Regions:
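Mature extracytoplasmic enzyme cores
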Residues: 1-166
Length: 166
């Protein structure tokens, strides 16, 4: 009637932050790792690789790599041992002639909460993983679709934009 248009950030807090619908698997992630020294020629059979630290109880493996010790290492000398690991245990014979460091890489949530948001929801709101298609689709489905339904005919007319800035 007045020709006004309105928009908003897409969730409580700063733009593209998330909400209570974001679980640790869909929250912002960071890479974590542990390492283990292995002498050249050593035979590892079911050797436990320490699991990296997990925030909020969520952790997923990315890769297990063996890097020969030395000041300069050629990329071709790094060995991918991921397929030799089962349930965190490694089966591998380290090539003789040099010592190795085995790295177990994974990812876990950063634990970052949305902000600024009302105190009553802050502890339940994790920031979404902006690099994950699945997490972004979850955020749209759970955070924006209810708004679209509630606004009805005003969606796209009076309510004309949502800011996404991350």
């Amino acid at each position: 009637r007045l020709g006004l248009e309105i928009g908003m950030h897409n969730s409580p807090g700063f733009s593209v932050t998330g909400g209570p619908w974001i679980d640790p698997a869909h929250a912002m992630q960071k890479v974590v790792w542990t390492k283990r020294a292995v002498p050249g020629g050593a035979v590892l059979k079911g050797a436990a690789l320490e699991r990296p630290w997990a925030c909020l109880g969520h952790y997923r493996d990315i890769a297990v790599l063996a890097v020969p010790d030395g000041a300069a290492v050629a990329a071709g000398d790094i060995l991918d041992l991921t397929s030799r690991v089962r349930d965190g245990a490694l089966d591998w014979r380290a090539p003789a002639g040099r010592n190795w460091t085995v790295y177990r890489f994974g990812h876990t949530p950063t634990g970052q909460r949305t902000h600024p948001v009302p105190d009553e929801i802050r502890k339940t709101c994790l920031e979404t993983d902006k690099l994950s298609r699945e997490a972004t689709e979850l955020h749209i489905r759970e955070g924006l679709e209810p708004l679209r339904k509630r606004l009805g005919r005003h969606w796209g007319r009076t309510f004309t934009h949502i800011t996404v800035d991350s």
